[in-house]
């Protein structure tokens, strides 16, 4: 086996992409591409990852469990509602106890503050598998997918059209970190969090990225390389039927994509609500790479797990 550099990360946890430098992100992506070609590398032999879920999941649960098996370890599913934490035990106490049993924690929950406390009180790595505010593992896979298509981030233009949600937040930070241009188009009142936008703009000043928040989807996708969308109603927002009317002009369809480059690629974090945020014609079309993108969750997360768990200089 050829020598491969395991990324050295200056963080115990991954809660948001703010914690990673541009160099660390690129290294993780390159390592993920290596692991994609070499799936059965027992780099985490005997390691146990606790998987705490308070939200429904397909991609996050399966990709983390499969990733740990491929790396020689084990993923242990923990239903947050069935744990004592769901009956009043503090996050702090839970963190300290789990640190004695397992080697790392992935948590998918609602409150980002709870994940921050879990990481603070744990002596083992904590990975944010999704909160209401951030989805960093998805953004890492998104960057990997873009990088595989372009082999660069310089000069690449990404448009995100839809709800300014957790996926949008992580993409803003990701784009700013790697120096990629990103335009967001949302209906009025559904813009991304102002503080996160400010953080992305500050990072962009250092990396040469361009960040723009608009309300016109046609302007947002003008001559872009990638068009990205997500569901209009995230988990926990069900019942907000008025959003369907407000978001209809933001549907990714054959008319909207004519404003992008002819070579554009379509991205979606999935699950998709077909004929709502995107038409079947687009998501199943030749320029859609959503299933390759979904597959890259596995490889990007494996790279992250190895880097956080082993924190060593070289893999041989």
UniProtKB/Swiss-Prot annotation:
Reactions it catalyzes: carbamoyl phosphate + L-ornithine = L-citrulline + phosphate + H(+)
Major enzyme class: transferase
Annotated Gene Ontology cellular component terms: cytoplasm
InterPro entries named in the record: Asp/Orn_carbamoyltranf_P-bd (IPR006132), Asp/Orn_carbamoylTrfase (IPR006130), Asp/Orn_carbamoylTrfase_sf (IPR036901), Asp_carbamoyltransf_Asp/Orn-bd (IPR006131), Orn/put_carbamltrans (IPR002292), OTCase_ArgI (IPR024904)
Matches recorded under Gene3D superfamilies: Aspartate/ornithine carbamoyltransferase
UniProt keyword S-adenosyl-L-methionine, yes or no: no
One term of GO molecular function: amino acid binding
Pfam family, one: OTCace
E.C. number(s) listed in UniProt: 2.1.3.3
Subcellular location: Cytoplasm
Function: Reversibly catalyzes the transfer of the carbamoyl group from carbamoyl phosphate (CP) to the N(epsilon) atom of ornithine (ORN) to produce L-citrulline.
Entries under PANTHER family matching the protein: ORNITHINE CARBAMOYLTRANSFERASE, MITOCHONDRIAL, ORNITHINE TRANSCARBAMYLASE, MITOCHONDRIAL
The protein's name in its UniProt record: Ornithine carbamoyltransferase
Species of origin: Bacillus cereus (strain 03BB102)
């Amino acid at each position: 086996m050829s020598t491969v550099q395991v990324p050295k990360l200056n963080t115990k946890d991954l809660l948001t992409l703010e914690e990673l430098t541009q160099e660390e992100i690129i290294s993780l992506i390159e390592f993920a591409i290596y692991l994609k070609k070499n799936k059965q590398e027992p780099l985490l032999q005997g390691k146990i990852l606790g998987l705490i879920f308070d939200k429904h999941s397909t991609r996050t649960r399966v990709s983390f469990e499969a990733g740990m098996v491929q790396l020689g370890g084990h993923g242990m599913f923990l239903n947050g509602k069935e744990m004592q934490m769901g009956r009043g035990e503090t996050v702090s106490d839970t963190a300290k106890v789990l640190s004695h049993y397992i080697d790392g924690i992935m948590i998918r929950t609602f409150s980002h503050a709870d994940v921050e406390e879990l990481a603070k009180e744990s002596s083992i790595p904590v990975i944010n598998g999704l909160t209401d505010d951030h989805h960093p593992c998805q953004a890492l896979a998104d960057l990997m997918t873009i990088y595989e298509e372009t082999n660069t981030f310089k000069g690449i233009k990404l448009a995100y059209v839809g709800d300014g949600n957790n996926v949008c937040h992580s993409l803003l930070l990701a784009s700013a970190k790697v120096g990629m241009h990103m335009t967001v188009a949302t209906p009025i009142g559904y813009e991304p969090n102002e503080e996160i936008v400010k953080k992305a703009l500050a990072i962009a000043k250092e990396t040469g990225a361009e960040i723009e928040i608009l309300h016109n989807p046609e302007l947002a996708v003008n001559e872009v390389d990638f068009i990205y969308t997500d569901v209009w109603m995230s988990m926990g927002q069900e019942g907000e039927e008025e959003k369907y009317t407000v978001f209809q002009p933001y549907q990714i369809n054959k008319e909207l994509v004519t404003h992008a480059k002819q070579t554009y690629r379509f991205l979606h974090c999935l699950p998709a609500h077909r004929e709502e945020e995107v038409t079947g014609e687009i998501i199943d079309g030749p320029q859609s790479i959503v299933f390759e993108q979904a597959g890259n969750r596995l490889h990007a997360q494996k790279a992250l797990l190895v880097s956080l768990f082993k924190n060593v200089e070289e893999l041989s």
